[in-house]
Every structure is written in C-alpha cells, then in structure tokens.
C-alpha cells in the first residue's frame, strides 16, 4: 500500500478507494486464516479440507501473479506470495492424506498417481491463468482469475459435503473465513473499478 493511498484513506475514510483498501485487508486476513485452518483440519481429520480443482486453481493463480505478473497484483503482491507459500503447506497436507479421500479407486492405490494428477491440474490452470492475463491484461486477469478461484473454492466445498456425507475435513472456521474473504474481495474489486484503480478499458 503506497504512502499516497494511505494519505487518501486518512483524508477520505469513506471514499470508494478507502473502503476498497480496508476490504482488501479483510480479505487478506480471511484467506490466510482459511488456508491455515485447512492445514489444521486436514491433519486433524486425516482427510483433505479442499478439493482438487480449487486447490490447483489457487496455486496456479498465485504462482502467476506472485512471480510471472507481480506488477498486476500491485500492493497485493506480498500477500499473494504469502498465500502461495501457505497453499504449498495445504498441498503437502492434502497429498499426505489424499489416498484416504480416493480409497477404493485406482488413484487411491498410489500416492504417485495423485501427485501426477495434482501436478497436471496445476499446470493446466497455470496455462489458463497465463492465457487470461495475455488476453485481458494483467490487472483484469488478476481479478477475474481470482474470481474463478473463489467460485471453485465455494462450489467444490459444497460438493465435498454432498459426496462425503459427513463434515470431516470441513469446519465452521474454514467456511466462515472463506465467506468473509469472498465478500470482502468481491467488494474490493468493485471499489477498485469505481475508483479507477483497476482499468476496465486497457491492458496492464
């Protein structure tokens, strides 16, 4: 967050830019809490707390905008890098207990197959995120690529509950942090567009 942005927030705390920045902070804390809670719940229940698609999409998005297009994430850059490392911890815990989630299937018989599955899906999503950034520009690609991550995270969580038939691997903290972060991130995007922080007619 630049010194100019901070001064504007102090001068106009209820402006679109100020509210957007405060919502970004809320989203940053919320998602970090969500990822840490997923690591804990996965270890405690010995069952992945996140499905394949949202985890792989998240890691691909974070890799793209933390290391390939860091300028597109602006002052989110440091946060996205923190999320990337937190997600590697989530991935490690997930791969450790993923065979329990795939028991009775060919994938569940070999951890190596699961590693290849996750690697392939991450690579596919990374290619998609890169194409999105090239087509729309980094600024819009950052936000719309993140929106895809949020959609998959929420919908796949519901899918896990329905297919598993129990709440192991899930918790109120995970769901609550995700809901708050999603709401904060969506409204922050709207505020960025309104304030002009995210251009809607040019590539970055």
UniProtKB/Swiss-Prot annotation:
Pathway listed: Secondary metabolite biosynthesis; terpenoid biosynthesis
InterPro entries, A to Z: PaxB-like
Stretches of the chain forming a coiled coil according to its record: none
Pfam family, one: Pyr4-TMTC
Membrane topology value: Multi-pass membrane protein
EC number: 4.2.3.-
Effects seen without this gene: Impairs the synthesis of austinol and dehydroaustinol.
Root EC class: lyase
This protein's record includes keyword Ribonucleoprotein: no
Segments passing through the bilayer: 19-39, 49-69, 75-95, 114-134, 138-158
Keywords: Lyase, Membrane, Transmembrane, Transmembrane helix
Cysteine pairings via disulfide bonds: none
Gene Ontology cellular component list: membrane
Residues spanning the signal sequence: none
Keyword Oxidoreductase set for record: no
UniProt-annotated location(s): Membrane
GO biological process: terpenoid biosynthetic process
Family of this protein: Belongs to the paxB family.
Physiological role: Terpene cyclase; part of the gene cluster B that mediates the biosynthesis of austinol and dehydroaustinol, two fungal meroterpenoids. The first step of the pathway is the synthesis of 3,5-dimethylorsellinic acid by the polyketide synthase ausA. 3,5-dimethylorsellinic acid is then prenylated by the polyprenyl transferase ausN. Further epoxidation by the FAD-dependent monooxygenase ausM and cyclization by the probable terpene cyclase ausL lead to the formation of protoaustinoid A.
Additional observations: In A.calidoustus, the austinoid gene cluster lies on a contiguous DNA region, while clusters from E.nidulans and P.brasilianum are split in their respective genomes. Genetic rearrangements provoked variability among the clusters and E.nidulans produces the least number of austionoid derivatives with the end products austinol and dehydroaustinol, while P.brasilianum can produce until acetoxydehydroaustin, and A.calidoustus produces the highest number of identified derivatives.
Protein name: Terpene cyclase ausL
Organism whose genome encodes this protein: Emericella nidulans (strain FGSC A4 / ATCC 38163 / CBS 112.46 / NRRL 194 / M139)
């Amino acid at each position: 967050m630049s010194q100019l942005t901070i001064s504007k927030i102090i001068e106009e705390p209820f402006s679109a830019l100020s509210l957007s920045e405060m919502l970004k902070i809320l989203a940053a804390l919320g998602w970090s809490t969500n990822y840490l809670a997923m690591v804990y719940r996965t270890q405690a229940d010995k069952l992945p707390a996140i499905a394949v698609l949202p985890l792989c999409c998240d890691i691909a998005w974070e890799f793209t905008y933390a290391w390939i297009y860091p300028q597109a994430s602006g002052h989110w850059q440091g946060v996205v890098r923190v999320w990337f490392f937190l997600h590697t911890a989530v991935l490690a815990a997930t791969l450790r207990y993923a065979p329990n989630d795939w028991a009775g299937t060919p994938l569940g018989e070999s951890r190596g197959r699961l590693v290849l599955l996750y690697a392939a899906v991450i690579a596919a999503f990374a290619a998609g995120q890169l194409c999105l950034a090239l087509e729309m520009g980094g600024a819009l690609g950052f936000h719309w690529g993140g929106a895809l991550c949020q959609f998959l995270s929420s919908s796949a969580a519901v899918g896990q509950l329905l297919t598993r038939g129990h709440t192991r691997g899930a918790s109120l903290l995970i769901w609550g942090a995700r809901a708050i972060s999603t709401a904060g991130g969506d409204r922050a995007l709207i505020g960025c567009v309104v304030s002009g922080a995210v251009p809607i007619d040019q590539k970055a």
